[in-house]
Amino acid sequence: MKERHAAECPLSCREAREWEIMVKNAVPVSEDERITVTWRKVIVCALVALVGFNLRSVILGVPPILPLIQHDLGFSYAATGLLTALPILVLACAAWPSGLLVERIGGRACVTIGLALLGAGAFLRALWPTALPLFFFTLLLSLGIAMSQTAVSPLVRSWFPAQIGLVIALFSDGLIIGEAVAAGATVPIMVQFLGRDAWRSTFVFWSVPVVGLLALWLWLAPAAHATAPVQLSSTADTTLSTISQSSTPPVKRARVSALHLGIMLGANSLIYFGMNGWIASYNQAIHQGGMTPLALATLNAAQLPASLGVTLFAQRIAGRRWPFIAAGVVCVIAIAGWVFTPAVLEPVWVTLLGGSSALVFTLGIALPPLLASHEEVARLTGITISLTYAVAFVGPFLGGVLWDTFRLPAVAFLPVALASVTLIVLGALLPSRAAFGLAGEARHVEEANSSVLQEHER
């Protein structure tokens, strides 16, 4: 009797458990990670936006006080430039390995570690006001930014599989608002409350919200499991294969290379950083230095309304080709207008450039969770971020080389023009939205889970 029962039951208890774990990792979205309760959705969306805010406020609070740091620590211009470029370099180098780490320990744990590194680095750099500790702790907090930013997309993919565009847009809003608030409020806060030359105190000021957010994250963030493949015994693996054949085949989804996404989003970042980096020098060279403050302020201010506006329609347009193509066309027109029209029109052109850049950034960071399967999101996100910031770092440098070579100020913006064309071409080559298959994946999850239950009951 026992032998007959054993023959009819293909899985032992241990193997059945292994099989269930495999299903959770094999199917795109795990049912137990979805957030379905409305009030919890609101809380988690707010957490995601706050993570974005703090990932930028800590580093964008530095440029306004950079002259004070340079004066007090005796930095050269090269050292000053390295301090501001270090977060971009770390993002370019660390995002890819961070994606692999997300697969191993899960996105929630990676954001936790990232926020801890960010808060610790932001606070500790205020304690030793010398060059080496400042660079070391900037490196530390930048590593925390890379880990947290890479982990957000896989988390959104797990928690909000049907609202990826909207939630990623909220995260993008947090990033952009963090940039704007830190850049605009750091000096007034320092002068009014901390002391006219108390630049070290601003480090502490921006670290406090990070610590508070870390506590909220540990308390309120839902669970998120690692997505690395699970090794099964041969019996369980054979049974999985048999049952999978009787269930609905996995959804075929569009394939897109990380190189494609990385270069496309890197081109967009190059447009933004290239304009920010060369507006002042260009205007000085053409004897229009008085236009620089307005041009820079408009370029950065245009991002916020564009990002907030995209948020309202993000769920409808996320994953579509035309926003990337349209943004590239607008950028080509704007950079041509910047170079060939009178300087008095500069605010018009930088408004178009800033708004288009924000649109592409908001929709672009939604592409990895839309295009990749559940277990591939972290890796694709990490590779994409690394390539994005590598391209963004190289672009402004290339503009300077061209200026030195040809002795023409306008050629510094040639990389921006090429990046705009690249945005059009690579945007047109994206898979169609219909090929993403998220709805089909959701049905596949339910069918796979149903198969687990039916086989276990046998």
Over which residues does each language-model region extend?
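Extracytoplasmic gate region of multi-pass secondary transporters
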Residues: 62-63, 256-307
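Cytoplasmic helix-loop-helix junction between adjacent transmembrane helices
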Residues: 137-173
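Helix-breaking motifs and short loop linkers at transmembrane-helix boundaries and internal kinks
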Residues: 74, 106, 127-132, 161, ...
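A late C-terminal transmembrane helix in Major Facilitator Superfamily
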Residues: 372-408, 416
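Conserved MFS/SLC helix-loop-helix module at the cytosolic interface between two early adjacent transmembrane helices
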Residues: 93-131
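Helix-loop-helix hairpin linking two adjacent transmembrane segments in secondary transporters
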Residues: 162-163, 170-222
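Helix-to-loop junctions at the C-terminal end of transmembrane segments
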Residues: 94-106, 307-319, 403
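C-terminal transmembrane helical hairpin of 12-TM major facilitator-type secondary transporters
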Residues: 320-364
